[in-house]
Amino acid sequence: MIKKILLGMTTLSCIALASQDTNLYLKTGADIWQKFDVITPRDSETINRKKADRMGYELTIETTREIYPNLELGAGISYQDHGSTKSLNDKDFDIKLDMPKFTSIPIYLTTKYNIPINSNIKPYLKADLGYSFNHNSGDLKFIDYELGETIKVSSDIKNGLYFGIGAGVEYNNFVADLMYKINKAKFETSTPYGKTKDDFDYSRVTLSVGYKFNF
């Protein structure tokens, strides 16, 4: 995964440095509101909560060019750590269900419209659309406290689309934006009885800050 991040960042940086009138954005963001899809396998109980166990974060690099007055178009790559859903406890059977950690590396097209106003603080609208390479840190775990056993179920988080839309402001090349984002995903489990695949999209509102370099 780290190799993918470094390769993507190196590629975008080279494109930015090789092109004239190019903008390079370096940003970091925090998920101030989060929601996972709730998984309910066939003939089974819910295995996760929609809330996250902690705040997610991301590190992003984007490169754009102005293709029309006030309109920028480009590409981006981001490392996004979503954490995992809060553990689900079944008090009737003294069982705890732990979901694996969920991370993504989306590669996407991005567009930014700078609203033309006579001010040092420049508002803008922004949208992203791309593909999310998703990864989970381990397997689904059923922890039976009564028996003192932990059962692991082989699991995988499949890739999917990524998109986001929002608005922000720019001041002296510093940028800050607030965006609604979704990473589409499927949660797949494998047992001796077969495989299951359920929607496991991650939705959130992300507050990002960063700096724009002009080349």
Tell me what each language-model feature is.
Residues 1-22, 214-215:
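Cleavable N-terminal export/targeting peptides
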Residues 18-65, 212-214:
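Short glycine/proline- and aromatic-enriched beta-strand/turn motifs that initiate or cap beta-hairpins
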Residues 19-22, 66-70, 116-120, 171-174, ...:
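Outer-membrane beta-barrel channels and translocator barrels
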Residues 23-27, 72-74, 122-126, 175-177, ...:
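Residue-level detector of the transmembrane beta-barrel scaffold of outer-membrane proteins
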Residues 23-25, 171-173, 201-215:
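Outer-membrane beta-barrel "beta-signal"
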Residues 30, 57-65, 77-79, 107-113, ...:
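Residues on the lipid-exposed face of transmembrane beta-strands in outer-membrane beta-barrel proteins
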Residues 33-54, 78-106, 132-162, 181-204:
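Extracellular/periplasm-exposed beta-strand and loop segments of Gram-negative cell-envelope proteins
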Residues 114, 121-135, 158-164:
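Structural signature of Gram-negative outer-membrane beta-barrels, strongest in the C-terminal barrel
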